Design a protein with these regions (language model features):
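Structured, active/binding-site neighborhoods that engage oxygen-rich ligands
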Residues: 1-152
Length: 152
Protein backbone atom coordinates (compact mmCIF):
# COMPACT_ATOMS: atom_id res chain seq x y z
CA UNK A 1 0.00 0.00 0.00
CA UNK A 2 2.99 2.33 -0.13
CA UNK A 3 2.52 3.03 -3.87
CA UNK A 4 -0.72 4.97 -3.45
CA UNK A 5 0.67 6.76 -0.40
CA UNK A 6 3.80 7.86 -2.25
CA UNK A 7 1.61 8.94 -5.18
CA UNK A 8 -0.38 11.13 -2.80
CA UNK A 9 2.80 12.64 -1.34
CA UNK A 10 4.29 13.29 -4.80
CA UNK A 11 1.05 14.86 -6.08
CA UNK A 12 0.30 16.94 -3.00
CA UNK A 13 2.15 20.14 -4.02
CA UNK A 14 0.23 20.18 -7.31
CA UNK A 15 -3.27 19.57 -5.95
CA UNK A 16 -6.06 21.93 -7.00
CA UNK A 17 -6.28 23.88 -10.25
CA UNK A 18 -4.15 26.82 -9.11
CA UNK A 19 -1.24 24.47 -8.32
CA UNK A 20 -1.45 22.19 -11.37
CA UNK A 21 1.81 21.74 -13.26
CA UNK A 22 1.17 20.06 -16.59
CA UNK A 23 4.72 18.96 -17.34
CA UNK A 24 6.88 16.02 -16.31
CA UNK A 25 9.99 17.95 -15.27
CA UNK A 26 9.42 18.48 -11.55
CA UNK A 27 11.16 17.22 -8.42
CA UNK A 28 9.48 13.99 -7.34
CA UNK A 29 9.71 15.02 -3.69
CA UNK A 30 10.08 18.53 -2.31
CA UNK A 31 9.64 20.39 0.97
CA UNK A 32 6.01 20.92 -0.04
CA UNK A 33 5.38 17.16 -0.43
CA UNK A 34 3.17 15.73 2.31
CA UNK A 35 0.49 13.13 2.83
CA UNK A 36 -3.12 14.26 2.51
CA UNK A 37 -6.58 12.92 3.19
CA UNK A 38 -6.08 10.61 0.20
CA UNK A 39 -3.43 8.70 2.15
CA UNK A 40 -5.67 8.43 5.15
CA UNK A 41 -8.54 7.11 3.03
CA UNK A 42 -6.10 4.58 1.55
CA UNK A 43 -5.74 3.24 5.08
CA UNK A 44 -9.49 2.65 5.14
CA UNK A 45 -9.27 0.77 1.84
CA UNK A 46 -6.42 -1.36 3.24
CA UNK A 47 -8.54 -2.27 6.25
CA UNK A 48 -11.47 -3.22 4.00
CA UNK A 49 -9.11 -5.42 1.97
CA UNK A 50 -7.84 -7.14 5.11
CA UNK A 51 -11.40 -7.72 6.32
CA UNK A 52 -12.49 -9.07 2.95
CA UNK A 53 -9.56 -11.49 2.80
CA UNK A 54 -10.41 -13.13 6.11
CA UNK A 55 -8.02 -11.43 8.52
CA UNK A 56 -9.07 -11.43 12.16
CA UNK A 57 -9.76 -8.24 14.09
CA UNK A 58 -6.49 -8.57 16.06
CA UNK A 59 -4.57 -9.00 12.78
CA UNK A 60 -6.28 -5.96 11.25
CA UNK A 61 -5.59 -3.88 14.37
CA UNK A 62 -1.93 -4.90 14.47
CA UNK A 63 -1.42 -4.19 10.76
CA UNK A 64 -2.95 -0.72 10.95
CA UNK A 65 -1.02 0.22 14.09
CA UNK A 66 2.31 -1.03 12.76
CA UNK A 67 1.95 0.15 9.17
CA UNK A 68 0.22 3.49 9.65
CA UNK A 69 1.02 4.36 13.26
CA UNK A 70 -2.59 4.81 14.39
CA UNK A 71 -3.42 4.39 18.06
CA UNK A 72 -6.29 1.92 18.07
CA UNK A 73 -6.07 1.16 21.79
CA UNK A 74 -8.91 3.51 22.69
CA UNK A 75 -12.48 2.32 23.10
CA UNK A 76 -15.70 3.85 21.83
CA UNK A 77 -16.57 4.67 25.45
CA UNK A 78 -13.29 6.59 25.79
CA UNK A 79 -13.74 8.45 22.49
CA UNK A 80 -17.40 9.47 22.90
CA UNK A 81 -17.15 12.13 25.67
CA UNK A 82 -14.68 14.40 23.88
CA UNK A 83 -15.13 13.60 20.20
CA UNK A 84 -16.65 16.31 18.02
CA UNK A 85 -17.09 17.10 14.33
CA UNK A 86 -13.65 16.98 12.76
CA UNK A 87 -13.14 17.36 9.03
CA UNK A 88 -9.74 15.71 8.89
CA UNK A 89 -9.39 12.08 7.97
CA UNK A 90 -6.57 11.72 10.50
CA UNK A 91 -9.11 12.19 13.26
CA UNK A 92 -11.88 10.20 11.60
CA UNK A 93 -10.41 7.01 10.11
CA UNK A 94 -8.93 5.64 13.37
CA UNK A 95 -12.22 6.22 15.17
CA UNK A 96 -14.13 4.48 12.37
CA UNK A 97 -11.77 1.50 12.60
CA UNK A 98 -12.22 1.36 16.38
CA UNK A 99 -16.01 1.39 15.90
CA UNK A 100 -15.60 -1.68 13.68
CA UNK A 101 -13.12 -3.44 15.98
CA UNK A 102 -15.55 -3.16 18.91
CA UNK A 103 -18.55 -4.40 16.93
CA UNK A 104 -20.22 -7.80 16.98
CA UNK A 105 -22.25 -7.40 13.76
CA UNK A 106 -22.71 -5.18 10.73
CA UNK A 107 -25.50 -3.20 12.38
CA UNK A 108 -23.58 -2.93 15.66
CA UNK A 109 -20.61 -1.47 13.78
CA UNK A 110 -22.79 1.28 12.28
CA UNK A 111 -24.35 2.01 15.66
CA UNK A 112 -20.88 2.26 17.23
CA UNK A 113 -19.78 4.73 14.54
CA UNK A 114 -22.81 7.01 14.82
CA UNK A 115 -22.69 6.89 18.63
CA UNK A 116 -19.26 8.55 18.60
CA UNK A 117 -20.77 11.81 17.36
CA UNK A 118 -18.71 14.08 15.16
CA UNK A 119 -18.84 13.59 11.40
CA UNK A 120 -21.34 10.76 11.73
CA UNK A 121 -21.96 10.08 8.05
CA UNK A 122 -18.25 9.84 7.25
CA UNK A 123 -17.57 7.67 10.30
CA UNK A 124 -20.47 5.35 9.46
CA UNK A 125 -19.49 5.26 5.79
CA UNK A 126 -15.95 4.10 6.56
CA UNK A 127 -17.08 1.72 9.30
CA UNK A 128 -19.83 0.37 7.05
CA UNK A 129 -17.33 -0.48 4.32
CA UNK A 130 -15.13 -2.40 6.73
CA UNK A 131 -18.08 -4.09 8.46
CA UNK A 132 -19.64 -5.19 5.16
CA UNK A 133 -16.34 -6.76 4.10
CA UNK A 134 -15.98 -8.53 7.45
CA UNK A 135 -19.55 -9.54 8.36
CA UNK A 136 -21.46 -9.20 5.12
CA UNK A 137 -24.53 -6.99 4.87
CA UNK A 138 -27.98 -8.28 5.82
CA UNK A 139 -30.25 -8.52 2.76
CA UNK A 140 -32.93 -6.37 4.38
CA UNK A 141 -30.45 -3.51 4.87
CA UNK A 142 -29.08 -4.01 1.37
CA UNK A 143 -32.61 -3.68 -0.05
CA UNK A 144 -33.30 -0.56 2.04
CA UNK A 145 -30.05 1.02 0.88
CA UNK A 146 -30.85 0.46 -2.78
CA UNK A 147 -34.34 1.94 -2.32
CA UNK A 148 -32.80 5.20 -1.12
CA UNK A 149 -30.52 5.68 -4.12
CA UNK A 150 -31.70 7.46 -7.27
CA UNK A 151 -32.25 5.18 -10.24
CA UNK A 152 -29.86 7.12 -12.42
Amino acid sequence: MLGPILGDIVGSPFEFDHNNYKHKDFPLLSEKSHFTDDTVMTVAVAVIFLARTGRSKPEIKQYVEQTFGYDLNRTCDEIRPTYHHVETCQETVPEAIIAFLESVSFEDALRNAVSLGGDSDTLACITGGIAEAFYGMPQELRDETLKRLPED
